[in-house]
Amino acid sequence: MPAPEQGSLVEEGQPQTHQEAVSTGPGMEPETTATTILASVKEQELQFQRLTRELEVERQIVASQLERCRLGAESPSIASTSSTEKSFPWRSTDVPNPGVSKPRVSDTIHPNNYLIRTEPEQGTLYSPEQTSLHESEGSLGNSRSSTQMNSYSDSGYQEAGSFHNSQTVNKADSRQHPFTGSTSNHVVRTSRAEGQTLVQPSVANRAMRRVSSVPSRAQSPSYVTSTGVSPSRGSLRTSLGSGFGSPSVTDSRPLNPSAYSSSTLPAQRAASPYSQRPASPTAVRRVGSVTSRQTSNPNGPVPQYQTTTRVGSPLTLTDAQTRVASPSQGQVGSSSPKRSGMTAVPQHLGPSLQRTVHDMDQFGQQQYDIYERMVPPRPDSLTGLRSSYASQHSQLGQELRSAVSPDLHITPIYEGRTYYSPVYRSPNHGTVELQGSQTALYRTGSVGIGNLQRTSSQRSTLTYQRNNYALNTAATYAEPYRPVQYRVQECSYNRLQHTGPADDGATRSPSIDSIQKDPREFAWRDPELPEVIHMLQHQFPSVQANAAAYLQHLCFGDNKVKMEVYRLGGIKHLVDLLDHRVLEVQKNACGALRNLVFGKSTDENKIAMKNVGGIPALLRLLRKSIDAEVRELVTGVLWNLSSCDAVKMTIIRDALSTLTNTVIVPHSGWNNSSFDDDHKIKFQTSLVLRNTTGCLRNLSSAGEEARKQMRSCEGLVDSLLYVIHTCVNTSDYDSKTVENCVCTLRNLSYRLELEVPQARLLGLNELDDLLGKESPSKDSEPSCWGKKKKKKKRTPQEDQWDGVGPIPGLSKSPKGVEMLWHPSVVKPYLTLLAESSNPATLEGSAGSLQNLSAGNWKFAAYIRAAVRKEKGLPILVELLRMDNDRVVSSVATALRNMALDVRNKELIGKYAMRDLVNRLPGGNGPSILSDETVAAICCALHEVTSKNMENAKALADSGGIEKLVNITKGRGDRSSLKVVKAAAQVLNTLWQYRDLRSIYKKDGWNQNHFITPVSTLERDRFKSHPSLSTTNQQMSPIIQSVGSTSSSPALLGIREPRSEYDRTQPPMQYYNSQGDTTHKGLYPGSSKPSPIYISSYSSPAREQNRRLQHQQLYYQDDSTRKTLDAYRLYLQSPRSYEDPYCDDRVHFPASTDYSTQYGLKSTTNYVDFYSTKRPSYRAEQYPGSPDSWV
């Protein structure tokens, strides 16, 4: 199934957020009095003065602490052993650390707010106050754990240098911050294994919300959450009580810094683990798609209630505001280095939440300026980041720089299909209650859904290693992996549902590399095609599933993309995924392959898939899979592949037996003793059966060898015929499955006499009496005294079978290939011809009777007799009136073969002559038939009038001579040479009846009208014939050899060049899919809502001179009817589909009442030419003998 089209998300949080931001803005509340405003301003001024003094004292303490950090040599501890996932929690500082004095002083350092971004609709605002970063391990009983949100076992790419390297962070690469008041920040790396719960002591009244950050390898698609400072981009940690990764609030307790050795980060901030700043905030709000940027005068006091929101800033990723303000609050932080190689240090919260907001927006312009001065983006940056990580050796240690490499970003992944999800709100009404009156809206990540199990063993077996910018290692893959943008249409996936409110015990911190990135660059983009193809080889199933689904989406209707995927080798990778153990990967790989091999112009893709073992891989998946959707996709891919001539024989050799035994026989119900109603419903709606029969339909046109193998496949013919019988009994005449079965059987019925040994043994050369003629080549042998008749001993039963009684030569019920030519198959074919309104089914059924009735063997005669017995001749004649070129052509050829039987010839000449003549071009009504169809009608007329003077006279009385003369003389529209020769042949036959020449002369015709010299026909070859056909339409060689063989087009001198392949692919095989040549209407030959149009007309009196009258209009005026340009029937079918369950087919009304549907008059005497209503075929009550017309 193609991936759904990606659409934009409606941000549900915007209206509410905007309202909150406005409601908290200064002066926005109309009921605020001047007295209240003045009091608030004074209170804020006093607070600002107090904070200024505190910060100044703290600056001095920080400077002394910095000096101690530089001089002190730090040794590795247990916290600095290997860890694939590091988190730097915010540390609360209002609980005194042992041995550390914490005076509250003023700080004059201006903070820089960093906007962290994970996706286009989301942003995260962190307070920039910096403190020491520690990650500790403690007992689970006395601590809260940070939350791991949707941990994956397949959530990222591994760096070239593995992070399981047991390196210790012992390099104190400290460097003085260019601004005063900067402090040291410590990164402590614990030995906690990946996926292990991070345990921290909790402290009451201190909370930090961490919901989102830049996407890391561990991020789940449901919640793109921050991993803190996660050097290896490992998985997020899931908190207890927050099973679905809900944002959580954690109380934190200060850790004993002496228990851990730490390496000092180069960029020093205004806080230290030994001098905690009391004014640092303890809550960071994730504001979803709403990015809150507070700006104010950096030098002036901040009013108590003032929160100015900057919307549309380059740092603001969405145009919505949120309210994060409360009275009596301020914020102080350290400034950030204004240089391109900006060192990103995780931000820490201080002890006081009261100063979180007000100073947060004081220096918003300064952080904008910082990003303006950053270096240009690297060409291989994954999300357009601007920081140069290779140049950070002066700020970060080797391992830390390796850890924060930006290329650890991957596409959001999930197990399952391509889902798109809107704004997600957790059960606690989408807001986070902070201290005081502060609230913050948050929204979790909206890309992808689902959890996968994560194992640390998979981290060291990654396929693609990328540049380690810190270690300057060579990359095995130069192109960056960029995240694929997936969104869901509705938030209905069960794994998004929360079972409880958010946990309030986990601490979070932003990742180091996320702080260094320019938020303006955090825009999701569609991945490039080479990236998607490389993701097919990723070790994680969800990445592979997403990549395959995205390829399916890209290939839909785009042949250029299909060819590019083939050029880049994507077909091989998709075929490899067919043997994947994950069901979703199998589905998406099949869907992508189905689109890649759809269409006439994708033969190279089909051949490439065959060459890489795609057909055996599909069959393995079909045999082992029990999932209905997978089986449908597999058979759909095979259906599309079967339209390529170069692949057909490979499918027959490798897949024919498997398709028959695993799909055709079980789904048809042929081997079931009982056929209940439930199986009928399953049978009629089985898409797997539809796809498989469509594949067999294409394969049956691959030539003689293909037909032989399919006929000899056990159970195939029986099952196909059983499907037709079942559908006839359930009145399911127009389904695609029936159409495919009928067309397959038509191809398998071709050249039975010559290709099937059983047919030759069952009775060749025994048809003289049945054909009503003598065949000198068969019944006499030359001798010196002339030809001597053979003496044959025949029982009376073997002489003929007229459709009554047991069939000679068949004493048992037929099985297998014998059922193809058994006369019992005539009845279901005629039922479909009488009841179906699907032109493809009608053409296939008529073509089957055409093939079965051709030939010089007794079963062809039996078929002709069976058609007469089952009253099938009127059914065929009615279809001549149909407004469908290919159906008329097939029916005319079938009638021509039926006329080989003497009694059939009499009936056709008596009751069908007018229909045949009226389909000839000329007269007042324009002809919409192709040259091939007109030639087929002329051949039928020739056969009907041969050796039957009454029929020749009926043709003259019907006005046929005038139309035939117009064709041969080139009057009106020019006809092709084939049509001219066929018409000349009929006229020549009519002139042979000497008794009728007087009638011809009375009507104004002479010999010149009937005899066209061969030289004239040859000259016509060089004339300009605009409508000269180039189609290799030929009659069956068997048809050419029976009856009045002069009616065969081959004897008319109609020879057209054709290759050896054309000889093995006869004209009856119109069933190979040609993919892109199909249009919305399956049958372009008819532009009417219903392709069936049968007119009625009265028979003029015999005494009238019908030759001098204008012919009655054959068709009523219909402005919607268009001229057929080459009606294609089965060359376009089946449709190699791309959409699931999508087979654009024309729906036709049920045709049970022929008087209303086809406009037949309601009279009771059918002998009065064509003016009666034929009795219902399904009533099966036909009066008269087997030779009667009705």
From Swiss-Prot:
Residues in the signal sequence: none
Subcellular localization: Cell junction, Desmosome; Cytoplasm, Cytoskeleton, Spindle; Cytoplasm, Cytoskeleton, Spindle pole; Midbody
ARM repeats: 517-556, 559-598, 603-643, 861-900
Superkingdom of origin organism: Eukaryota
One Pfam family matching this protein: Arm
Membrane topology: Peripheral membrane protein
Chief location: other
GO cellular component term of the entry, any: cytoplasmic side of plasma membrane
Regions of compositional bias (Polar residues) in chain numbering: 77-86, 138-156, 163-203, 213-229, 247-266, 289-323
InterPro entries to which the protein is assigned, alphabetical: ARM-like, ARM-type_fold, Armadillo, Plakophilin/d_Catenin
Residue positions where Phosphothreonine is found in the record: 84, 411, 1012, 1016
Residues covered by region (Disordered): 1-32, 73-347, 772-809
Positions with biased composition (Low complexity): 230-241, 324-337
Composition skew (Basic and acidic residues), residue ranges: 772-781
UniProt keyword annotations, A-Z: Cell adhesion, Cell junction, Cell membrane, Coiled coil, Cytoplasm, Cytoskeleton, Membrane, Methylation, Phosphoprotein, Repeat
Assembly, per entry: Interacts (via the C-terminus) with FRMPD2 (via the PDZ 2 domain). Interacts with PDZD2. Interacts with RHOA; the interaction is detected at the midbody. Interacts with ECT2; the interaction is detected at the midbody. Interacts with CCDC85B.
Function: Plays a role as a regulator of Rho activity during cytokinesis. May play a role in junctional plaques.
Listed name of the protein: Plakophilin-4
Provenance organism: Mus musculus
Gene: Pkp4
